[in-house]
Amino acid sequence: MKKFALLPISLFTALAITACGDSESGNPVTPESSDQPSISSEALPGSSAALPASSTSVPGSSETVPPASSATVPNSSATVVTPVEFTTEAVVVPDMGCTTEPLTVASGVKVTCDGQFAGNVQDDEDTTPFDPNAAAYISFVGIQKIYESLEATDKVVFLLRHAHRTASTDSTGVLTGKGYIQADRVGQHIAGTEEIKYWHSEISRTLQTCMAIAQGRGQTEISHVALKDLNGGWFEKDHAKIEEYYANEPTSYDVVSRWAYNDYLDPATTYNDGYYDLMERGAQFMNDIVLAKIAPQSRISIVVSHDQMLYPLTIFATNRALEMKHHEDKSWLNFLAGVAVIIKADGTVKYVPVKGLDEGTMSS
């Protein structure tokens, strides 16, 4: 039996933000309930300002394939690297009173915290080979496969949802003991001595996830930075309008799902007044944030955000071909899943749905 005993921590408490799941327009976020789960309070909404013009051309309609395998890094990121002030500190993860023991029927561990069964953490056991030269991937690929497929001249940005959290979906929600172990095991799958830069939102559970991944990799120090653009509301244009849409669907997850897949019961009814265009806004994030800001800082980057942002971004990255339609089958983005952005030496870019655990989706 392995004891998951780690160092005590105070910085997460200091980083935790006062509950502020409000949109910047001042409209309160609908709290999550057992009758109507809400993803709107999973993270801090981003800016509700008008969609700024991208520095590169972006797809103009929902039918346009995202620049997955033919896109190139924007000129600005290829010629000028804007300095980023990272915080470098010791890797510190709290002792959650958890122990682990190997599973007997699958690869992974059984987690017990404070004497109570906390769940199983299963590893990816899909033996299908990953072909980095395939034209497109529309299903989730294990993070270890992608990491091990990288050539020395490749860069990769792993965009991941945080690990398992407490019930609170607002800024007070933190990782559970199971969540720390999930993230630690993801780190073990990409262990190595090469430096990784970590990016996270302003909400503490994303930094906690980064810390645990770094620990799993064998790091004693971590270089990280908080980025407001990762707070969760990147795709939201008018949060108050989005809240009005909740009356149309069984859950708020279904609102996001129908908008992201452009799949409505009544074609005359859309949610476009509340959300930006998926393809335009997704391409803008990839071009202006991932390729121009994050990727130039290190060969390998870990970016931890929230499902409110990464669910639609993953759908964008597969041109809506990924099967994750909550409004049909209740499937949702799993913890530690998202998108791997692989950048070749010649500037071509490939998007691959990535999973850190055994499955890329979960039922919500």
Please place each PLM-identified region on the residue numbering.
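Hydrophobic residues embedded in beta-strands of well-ordered beta-sheets
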Residues: K110, F117, G347-K350
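Low-complexity, serine/threonine/proline-enriched polar segments
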Residues: S223-G274
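Bacterial Sec-dependent N-terminal signal peptides
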Residues: F4, I9-V91, D95-M96, E101, ...
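Active-site-adjacent alpha-helix immediately C-terminal to a catalytic or transition-state-stabilizing loop
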Residues: E280-T348
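Active-site-proximal alpha-helix that buttresses catalytic centers in soluble enzyme cores
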Residues: G119, D123-W234, A268, N272-Y276, ...
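Low-complexity, Gly/Ser/Thr/Pro-rich intrinsically disordered linker/tail segments
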Residues: K350-S364
